[in-house]
């Protein structure tokens, strides 16, 4: 991914890193085959700019502490991400709706990148004056 996201870049956050726990090994293998096929199709279409699974464990940092984390329920924990290129938020949502993980209890959050990270704050200040 380029250092600066473009207006056509969208982040897909895949949540629920315990989706496989109730599945048999063959069901997990089948699910991974479907996920791989979906990912490869997005690559062929030139939609994927970046993607990676995340480790289950990490650290949570506040202004004064560093603790083991995340502490969110496993169904809320971020399992991985995709950065996709799409013409619109609606197209990015359609890409997300095809994620095979949805059938397994995962959720996908779709977010546009803020091209100007302070855009909302500037608008609020301008509106106040």
How would you name each of these model-derived features?
Residues 1-129:
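Conserved, structured core segments of small domains
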